[in-house]
């Protein structure tokens, strides 16, 4: 079960996912491609993306950090769509993180891959 936290400025969310870093990175690219997002890899752990969430085009930083028990996923709103409210920013950030988490659950847990690899 992922652990969630929202940072005080409301423009970032972090969650620890019970998957290795490689799977989380793959999920990020799959979600971005599925949503037709433009993105660039800035380093081995960070992707900057322009993505439409709920019809609002915003700029995000998506970062992964390997932890002792899983991988920390961090989604930060770098540039919100003009006029997007603070609650809209938080919903968009949560939607991006949820999409990545859901992809991992669907592809690894539901298909049994994750369970087989961890036996």
PLM region spans:
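Ser/Thr-rich, low-complexity intrinsically disordered terminal regions
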Residues: 1-119
